Amino acid sequence: MKHFLLSVLLSCLSLAAFAQTKVSSSTYGAIEARSIGPAVMGGRITAIEGVNKTPKVLYVGTAGGGVWKSTTAGFTFEPVFEKYPQSVGAIAIDQNKPETVWVGTGESNMRNSVSVGMGMYKSTDGGKNWNRIGLENSEHISKIVLNPNDGNVAYVAVPGKLWSDSPDRGLYKTSDGGKTWEKILYTDEKTGCADIIMDPRNPDVLLASMWQFRRTPYSFTSGGPGSALYKSTDGGKNW
């Protein structure tokens, strides 16, 4: 018992002495900074978009942590999408009106651990507020491309459901800022749109890749007769 009391007394004296010791920043100079939070990870980075005229403004989409915004070129970030589906597949910014941001929910990395989304969302105030603007049954969105001459015209690539056939796969277009959508390229229920690019000199020229795939609990089938590359020279009217 005496030894126990002596140990406690020595510990208290040591703590008191440590509390009075002055610690300078050089004491910890050799320790490298490391991430200690938040506890809930954001997951994979699935999309990054920046504002051309204001390079310090960035939006980052994640597989499980929503959308984050930086106004310091990536030194600091704040979450701006906490009330909405946290799985994000694509982001696009209207460079003529950079406060207008489009987000497609549901990441397109077709792993067996992905989460689904709930369609397209849009903000007109730099991420402060969001409205859902359609494609609710898409589940996974891989790309958003905006017409640089008309911010109301957008193309959205939808791979579609991971585990089953779906008629909601394909390439969609809106000409009214997301109020209405038209499916402009569709192969079959097994094949979705994986990617789309636009000729920066002529926004009517598009290339779209269609991808046939299917995930099962223990396997993944990638490719098939539905997979192909398509080109349009009239804004998606013909392919």
What are these language model-derived features?
Residues 1-21:
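Bacterial Sec-dependent N-terminal signal peptides
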Residues 20-239:
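Beta-propeller blade termini and top-face loops
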